[in-house]
């Protein structure tokens, strides 16, 4: 049987996430960076979450070639104890 009554329209509530407010673009392409240095800790900290995870490129807008370099640079900085592996020290 067909339903001829009014249908309830569902509203989509979007969650406000600070990573999605701005338009995504590659910071390294805009700055003309050729290679990401593991000693540039201020830049690397922008791409690491509080718990120590590397933020994925789909959230930051980083191009794939720079995301691979960023991944390697963060891992080198962690190995040399320039960056912590986690922020949760007990």
Curated annotation (Swiss-Prot):
Pfam families: Ribosomal_S18. GO terms for cellular component: cytosolic small ribosomal subunit. It comes from the Bacteria. PROSITE patterns: RIBOSOMAL_S18 (PS00057). The keyword Ribosomal protein applies. Keywords: Ribonucleoprotein, Ribosomal protein, RNA-binding, rRNA-binding. One of its GO terms (molecular function) is small ribosomal subunit rRNA binding. InterPro entries: Ribosomal_bS18, Ribosomal_bS18_CS, Ribosomal_bS18_sf. One of its GO terms (biological process) is translation. Binds as a heterodimer with protein bS6 to the central domain of the 16S rRNA, where it helps stabilize the platform of the 30S subunit. Belongs to the bacterial ribosomal protein bS18 family. Part of the 30S ribosomal subunit. Forms a tight heterodimer with protein bS6. This is Small ribosomal subunit protein bS18. The gene is rpsR.
């Amino acid at each position: 049987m067909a339903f001829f009554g009014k249908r309830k329209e569902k509203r989509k509530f979007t969650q406000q996430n600070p990573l999605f407010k701005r338009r995504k673009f590659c910071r390294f392409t805009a700055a003309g960076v050729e290679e990401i240095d593991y000693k540039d800790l201020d830049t690397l900290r922008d791409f690491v979450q509080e718990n120590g995870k590397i933020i994925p490129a789909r959230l930051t807008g980083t191009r794939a070639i720079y995301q691979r370099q960023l991944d390697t640079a963060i891992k080198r900085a962690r190995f040399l104890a320039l960056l912590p592996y986690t922020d949760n020290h007990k």
